[in-house]
């Protein structure tokens, strides 16, 4: 069995996690109390969904995940929510005081008290697996817990489970909308360890997803629930091939192999199509070609980043529902002829496709229409460099004046860590430039040696 353990850290991680598990349960027909009427074999069957759920002797399905936060309010919502009976109480870990938007509190002072407990619970989950495949880590890097405790946990996971792949779903600060003044500090410090300790990081940001909700779903004032349900659809499409059977299944480690040309360049754009409200869906065809084109639209990217400003290095398309390989090949061929979608010259083919026959499920009373087929795209583009340049610029403006730095130093950090993280990101920006620029013949004598 190829199990996957999900780790939800901090408020963003937990709320996205809630939306994900709600959707998984609907997809598999698992009730909020963990019972699954359709599953006849009691005990750990060999069903595909057992990658995400473990089964007890009483026939209850328990998610393989932990929820981790430094303060109790958000975890308490899970403890009292609709799915409270789904989770084992030990899977919900909360501390007493929060990280106060401070990376150093999450990483050093308060985080380190709780991290051993979390690793202990993860160890229990891992012991329950026959062939653990890897971890999905959900966090945001703007706050204190997601960034600080998230980095700490990833570092410790690298030590304990060195060879297992780690996929991150990371909410980055948006260009215009901000929830904390010190976001640039937290995200730069956190990205410094994401670079080292995740194999693939899928970037998300709230502003981009707000815009998608407003534009495509006609929601005037989107809430976090709207955003999270959209993110859950993306994550569900990514993991569908682990949880269901299909024609071209895609494994967690396969993402890495196909999307990461150089170890450091592993930050991905994601998009999903069709994002459409029920009123509109009734009048549209939404063929494979249409949804494939929609997935490449700059406006459907889940992070504020225009892929037309860079080149694609690799691209993964996961289709689900009523899709046959012939349609996919035709759609991809059309995409390749478009001049707007450019690939780097050293990666001519660049497409990995997966098909899953399970049609997309929607949350009843949610915003998305029930459709016959959908596609989720994860792509590695040099345009992602923009996001880091944007962050670094904001970081520099504050750090030049050493604004707010004393809060971090007071929690036991050293100023050197700021400059070290910032230099690491400067190197990353440079990596993106080189990868976009280096052509097949120039790679020999250029900066190609450092990889």
Curated annotation (Swiss-Prot):
What InterPro entries has UniProt attached to this entry?
Answer: Alpha_tubulin, Tub_FtsZ_C, Tubulin, Tubulin/FtsZ-like_C, Tubulin/FtsZ_2-layer-sand-dom, Tubulin/FtsZ_GTPase_sf, Tubulin_C, Tubulin_CS
- Which residues are recorded with the post-translational modification N6-acetyllysine? 40
Q: What is this protein called?
A: Tubulin alpha-1/alpha-2 chain
Function summary: Tubulin is the major constituent of microtubules, a cylinder consisting of laterally associated linear protofilaments composed of alpha- and beta-tubulin heterodimers. Microtubules grow by the addition of GTP-tubulin dimers to the microtubule end, where a stabilizing cap forms. Below the cap, tubulin dimers are in GDP-bound state, owing to GTPase activity of alpha-tubulin.
Q: Please outline how this chain is modified post-translation.
A: Undergoes a tyrosination/detyrosination cycle, the cyclic removal and re-addition of a C-terminal tyrosine residue by the enzymes tubulin tyrosine carboxypeptidase (TTCP) and tubulin tyrosine ligase (TTL), respectively.
- Catalytic reaction(s) noted: GTP + H2O = GDP + phosphate + H(+)
Could you tell me which species this protein originates from?
Answer: Volvox carteri
Enzyme class at the top of the EC tree: hydrolase
Predominantly, its location class is cytoplasm
* Lineage of the organism: Eukaryota, Viridiplantae, Chlorophyta, core chlorophytes, Chlorophyceae
Instruction: Give UniProt keywords alphabetically.
Output: Acetylation, Cytoplasm, Cytoskeleton, GTP-binding, Hydrolase, Magnesium, Metal-binding, Microtubule, Nucleotide-binding
Which sites bind Mg(2+)? 71
GO terms for molecular function, please?
GTP binding; hydrolase activity; metal ion binding; structural constituent of cytoskeleton
Name its co-factor(s). Mg(2+)
What are the GO cellular component annotations?
cytoplasm; microtubule
Instruction: Locate the active site.
Output: 254
């Amino acid at each position: 069995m190829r199990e996957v353990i999900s780790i939800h850290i901090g408020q963003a991680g937990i709320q996205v996690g809630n939306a994900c598990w709600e959707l998984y349960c609907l997809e598999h027909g698992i009730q909020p109390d963990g019972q699954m009427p359709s599953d006849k074999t009691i005990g750990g069957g060999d069903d595909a969904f057992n990658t995400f759920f473990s089964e007890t002797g009483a026939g209850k399905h328990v998610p393989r995940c932990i929820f981790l936060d430094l303060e109790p309010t958000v975890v308490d919502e899970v403890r009292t929510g609709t799915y409270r009976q789904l989770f084992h109480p030990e899977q919900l870990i909360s501390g007493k005081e929060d990280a106060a938007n401070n990376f150093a509190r999450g990483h050093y002072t308060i985080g380190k008290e709780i991290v051993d407990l979390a690793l202990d619970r993860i160890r229990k989950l891992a012991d329950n697996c026959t062939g653990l495949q890897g971890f999905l880590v959900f966090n945001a890097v703007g706050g204190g817990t997601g960034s600080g405790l998230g980095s700490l946990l990833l570092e410790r996971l690298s030590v304990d489970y060195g060879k297992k792949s780690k996929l991150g779903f990371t909410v980055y600060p948006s260009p215009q909308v901000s929830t904390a003044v010190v976001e640039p500090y937290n995200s730069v410090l956190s990205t410094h360890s994401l670079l080292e300790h995740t194999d693939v990081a899928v970037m998300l940001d709230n502003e981009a997803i707000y815009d998608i909700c407003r534009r495509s779903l006609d929601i005037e004032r989107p809430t976090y629930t709207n955003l999270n349900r959209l993110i859950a659809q993306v994550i569900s499409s990514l993991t569908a091939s682990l949880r269901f059977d299909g024609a071209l299944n895609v494994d967690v480690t396969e993402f890495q192999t196909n999307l990461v040309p150089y170890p450091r360049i592993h930050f991905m754009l994601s998009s999903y199509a069709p994002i459409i409200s029920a009123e509109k869906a009734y009048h549209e065809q939404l063929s494979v070609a249409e949804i494939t084109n929609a997935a490449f639209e700059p406006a459907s990217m889940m992070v504020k980043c225009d892929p037309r400003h860079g080149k694609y290095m690799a691209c993964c398309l996961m289709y689900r529902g009523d899709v046959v390989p012939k349609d996919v090949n035709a759609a991809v061929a059309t995409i390749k002829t478009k001049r707007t979608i450019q690939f780097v010259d050293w990666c001519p083919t660049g497409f990995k496709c997966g098909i899953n026959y399970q049609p997309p499920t929607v949350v009843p009373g949610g915003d998305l229409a029930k459709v016959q087929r959908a596609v989720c795209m994860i792509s590695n583009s040099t345009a992602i460099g923009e996001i880091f340049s944007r962050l670094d610029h904001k970081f520099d403006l504050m750090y030049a004046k050493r604004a707010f730095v004393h809060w971090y130093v007071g929690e036991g950090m050293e100023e050197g860590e700021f400059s070290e993280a910032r230099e690491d990101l400067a190197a990353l920006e440079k990596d993106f430039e080189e990868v976009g620029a280096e052509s097949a013949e120039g790679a020999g004598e250029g900066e190609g040696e450092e990889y």
